[in-house]
C-alpha cells in the first residue's frame, strides 16, 4: 500500500513540475511584462505578390512571366493580451509594393493610345502590365497564442494609398500574332508589333481607388525573447478600379505577402 501511495505522490510531483515548466515557458515567451499585459512590435519585411483578377478571365490564355516590384514594409503594432492565449492588436504598416506581368491574351478588351488618341477594342497577342503602390495598411486583428512561441492573428484591414502607378503595352506574341479589333470582336484589324509596342493611356492611375479593404492573416514565431520571425498575408476584398472605369472589364484585387523580422518591447 505504501508503494502505491509513494507512486501516486511521485506522479503528482512530476505533473506539478511539468506544469511549472510549462507556465515558466509561457512567462518566458509571453509579453515582456506578463502574460496578460501588452506591448509593441516593430516590423520590417519584404513584400511580394501582385494585383490579379479572381478567377483569371478566359481572355488571359497564358502567363509568360511575373515578378514583384518594390517589396518593403515598415510597421508598428500595439497588442494587448486578455488571457494567456487571447488578445488583440492594431497597427500601421507602411509599404511599397508592385508587380510586372507578361501574358498572352485573346480577344482581350483594352484601351490603347495611338498618336495621342485612345483606341478601344479587342486585342490578341502579348499584354504587359506594371504597377507600383505606396501606402499604409491599418490592421485590427484578434490574436491567438497556439503555443508559448507561436502566435496567429487574423482580422480586417484598411489600406490607404499615397501614390499609385499602372502602365502597360501590347505587341505581337512569340508566334508573331498581335492585332486589335477596333470597337468590336469583328471590327477593323490593327496590327501591333514588339518593334513598336502600343501603350495604355497614361491616365489609368487616376482611375484607381485610393483605399482598399481586406483580410489579414499573420503568423509570429518567437525566435528570441524580443525577436520574432513573422509572415503575413493581405488579401484584398475590394476592386482597385473605380466602379465606373470601363477600360478594365474585370475586377482586380491586391494580394500581397510579407515575411520579415520583428522586435517586441
Regions found by a protein language model. Give the residues of each.
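Hydrophobic, lipid-facing positions within transmembrane beta-strands of outer-membrane proteins
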Residues: 38-40, 70-76, 134-140, 211-217, ...
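Transmembrane beta-barrel strands of outer-membrane/channel proteins
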Residues: 42-48, 90-96, 154-160, 215, ...
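Extracellular/periplasm-exposed beta-strand and loop segments of Gram-negative cell-envelope proteins
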Residues: 50-69, 97-133, 161-210, 238-256
Amino acid at each position: 500500500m505504501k508503494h502505491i501511495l509513494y507512486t501516486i505522490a511521485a506522479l503528482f510531483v512530476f505533473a506539478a513540475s511539468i506544469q511549472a515548466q510549462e507556465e515558466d515557458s509561457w512567462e518566458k515567451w509571453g509579453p515582456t511584462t506578463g502574460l496578460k499585459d501588452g506591448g509593441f512590435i516593430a516590423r520590417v519585411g519584404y513584400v511580394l505578390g501582385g494585383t490579379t483578377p479572381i478567377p483569371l478571365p478566359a481572355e488571359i490564355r497564358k502567363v509568360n512571366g511575373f515578378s514583384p516590384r518594390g517589396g518593403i514594409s515598415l510597421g508598428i503594432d500595439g497588442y494587448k493580451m486578455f488571457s494567456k492565449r487571447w488578445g488583440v492588436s492594431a497597427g500601421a504598416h507602411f509599404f511599397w509594393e508592385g508587380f510586372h506581368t507578361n501574358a498572352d491574351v485573346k480577344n482581350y478588351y483594352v484601351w490603347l493610345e495611338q498618336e495621342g488618341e485612345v483606341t478601344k477594342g479587342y486585342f490578341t497577342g502579348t499584354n504587359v502590365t506594371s504597377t507600383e503602390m505606396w501606402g499604409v495598411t491599418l490592421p485590427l486583428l484578434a490574436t491567438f497564442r497556439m503555443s508559448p512561441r507561436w502566435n496567429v492573428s487574423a482580422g480586417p484591414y484598411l489600406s490607404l494609398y499615397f501614390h499609385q502607378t499602372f502602365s502597360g503595352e501590347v505587341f505581337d506574341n512569340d508566334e508573331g500574332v498581335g492585332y486589335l479589333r477596333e470597337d468590336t470582336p469583328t471590327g477593323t484589324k490593327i496590327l501591333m508589333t514588339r518593334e513598336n509596342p502600343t501603350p495604355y493611356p497614361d491616365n489609368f492611375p487616376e482611375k484607381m481607388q485610393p483605399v482598399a479593404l481586406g483580410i489579414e492573416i499573420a503568423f509570429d514565431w518567437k525566435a528570441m525573447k524580443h525577436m520574432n520571425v513573422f509572415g503575413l498575408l493581405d488579401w484584398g476584398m475590394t476592386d482597385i478600379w473605380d466602379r465606373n472605369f470601363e477600360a478594365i472589364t474585370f475586377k482586380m484585387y491586391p494580394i500581397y505577402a510579407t515575411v520579415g523580422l520583428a522586435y517586441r518591447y
